[in-house]
């Protein structure tokens, strides 16, 4: 079992070391608790099936309940989906970063484990 590590980041712009440590944990298959615009969430690398399964296990979440993939900027979207409708671009430009989730056709790069077995991905 992995040891719990507390990293307090009050302002990401002023705590590069903490942000890099959290990123390192994610890159190595670990889980990180993060605040989002609406709730606190348990984050994992969306490309890492074992890490995603660890989120399902930690939360007692059914594996057919898709994860939401969070991205830092709109430029990351094309790697995650096979199509970006014009209205999705307009919404993303207007509301991201912010509490807007869009469901789009998933790229084959996103494991089905992350999408709960669906051919779409929530971003």
Residue ranges and their predicted role:
Residues 1-123:
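Active-site-adjacent structural elements in enzyme catalytic cores
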């Amino acid at each position: 079992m992995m040891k719990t590590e507390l990293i307090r980041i009050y302002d990401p712009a002023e705590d590069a070391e903490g942000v890099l440590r959290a990123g390192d944990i994610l890159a190595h298959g670990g889980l990180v608790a993060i605040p989002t615009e609406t709730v606190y969430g348990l984050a994992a690398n969306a490309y890492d099936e074992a890490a995603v399964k660890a989120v399902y296990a930690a939360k007692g979440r059914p594996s057919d309940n898709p994860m939401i993939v969070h991205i830092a900027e709109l430029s990351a979207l094309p790697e995650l989906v096979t199509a970006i409708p014009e209205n999705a671009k307009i919404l993303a430009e207007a509301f991201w970063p912010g509490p807007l989730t869009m469901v789009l056709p998933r790229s084959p790069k996103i494991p089905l484990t992350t999408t709960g077995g669906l051919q779409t991905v929530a971003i």
